[in-house]
Amino acid sequence: MNSVMRNLGLSALAVAVLTSCAATSTETATPATTPQAYQVPLAQPPQVSQPLTLNQIMANPDWMGIFAKEAYWSDDSQSVFFARQASASPLRNYYQQGINDSRAVELAIDKLHAADQQFGVLDSAKANKAYLYQGNIFVKHLSSGKITQLTRQRTAISGLRYLNNGDIAYWQGDNVFQIHQDSGLVEQLAEIKMAKAPEGVKEPSSYLAKQQHRLIQYVALQQENAKAKEQFKNELQKSDPTLAANTWYLGDAEVVSELSLSPDGRYLFVALTDKNYTGSSEHDIMPNYLGSEGYIDPVPVRARVAEDNPPGQRFVVLDLNEHKQIDVTIEGLTGFDEDVLAKVKSENAKAKGESYQSTKAPRKIQLMQDWGWTQSAIQWHESENKLAVMVEATDNKDRWIASVDLAKGKFITEHRLHDDAWVNYDYNQFGWLPGTDSLYYLSEETGYSQLYIKARGEKPRALTQGKFVVSDITLSPDANYIYYKANQSHPGMYNVHR
C-alpha cells in the first residue's frame, strides 16, 4: 500500500511539473480540432471470484446493473409499474410489468398520463380515482379504466381530495377550488392573501378633514358616493349566490406553509411561517468547484444546526361557511412550555461558576418534518370533520399527535413522544382508522418504533412489542387489517406482517 501511494504521489508530481513547464513556455500550441466532451468510463464489474476494490466501491453504481426503482402496484393489482435509468443517463424510462408476463413493456412518453398513478385519491365509493399528472387533474373510472382530464393549464395544482358529496376539491397556490361533478362548475372556495385587509371607506377624523367635508359640497358628495358603492358591493356579496367567497386576509408578516381542506369542504386548516425565514443565511454556502462557467460557484445550503433559529409556525382554522378565522392555540400540547434544556443549561452555568434558574415559556411549534414519508402531517378523518395533526418543537425534543377542536381552535394532546437527544425524523406514520374514532401511529417511546392505536380520550394500546423496528404502515381496503414491515427475526431482515 505504501508503495502504491508513493507511486501515485510521484506520478502526480510529474504531472504537476510538466504542467508547470507547459504554462511557462513562450510558445502556445493551437489544437487542430475542437476537443470533445470527456466521457468518464464506468468501472468494470468484478468477477465473482474477485474481491471488491475501493475503486469499485466508489465508482458510479451503474456497473452493478440497471435497477428497477419506485415500483408500485397497478389499480387492478395485475401489474407493477416501475422506472429504470439507463447507464450514464439523466433521464428515466417507465415500464409496466404484468404479473403473468415474462417481459416488461416500456411506456411511450405520450401515454405516461394514462399510466396508473401511485399517489391518487379515491372517492368514498372507491369507484373513481383522481390524481395529478404534470400539475393537472385526471380522473380514472376504475371499473372501465376510462380516464378524463379535468384541467389543462400551466400553473401547477399542488394537491387535491374528494369531498363527501363526490366533488373534487383542489388547491393551487393559496387558493382552494371545488369542481362540481353534476355541472362541471369550478367554484373558488377560498382565496388567501398574505396582506393586511383593506380598510374601506374611512370617515374624516382630523378637524381639518371634518371642516373640508362640511364646507365643500363636492368633497362631501365624493365621500357619500364611495360609501354607497362600498355598501352595494357588500350587499351584493351577501345576496348573489353566483359570486365567489370573500377573500381571506391573513396579514403581511407570514407565508402559507401548508393547507388542508376538511371532507365536507367547510374548514381549511392553515400553517403559517414567518416570511423572512429561509433556513439559511449569506454565510451558509458550499463551494462548487465544477461550476459550468469555470468559476467556483457558491451554492446556498441550509443553516448549521447550532446557528439555525426556526421561528415555528402559527396555525389557523378558516370556517368557509361562516367566513370566520379561528386562531389555534398550543396550550393543549402537554409540555408546550417546559424548559427541556434546563439540565444542560444548568450544567453549563455550573461550569462557569454561575447558577441557572429554569422558567416556563412557550416553545416554538411547527408541523412535523419527516424525511421519509409521503403523507402529510395534517390528517382529516375519512368522512367526518375530525382533524389530527403531528407537530414538533423546533428544539427537536418533542413530537405530538394532537386532535384539533375546530370550533374553539385548540390542540388536544393524543400522544407525546419526548427524547432528550433528538426526536427521529422517521417512523412517524399516523392516521385515522376508517369508520372509528381511533388513531393509529408509530412511536419510539420504548426505544424501538412500534405500532399503537388510540381512541380519543382513552389510553393507547400497543399492537406490537419488542426490540425490533416497525415501519411502512398500510391499511387493508376494508380497514380490518394493518400491514407493516418489521425486522423481528433479525436486524437486517425485514418481513411483511399483518
Where are these regions (language model features)?
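Beta-propeller folds
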Residues: 10-11, 17-498
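Bacterial N-terminal signal peptides that target proteins for export
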Residues: 1-9
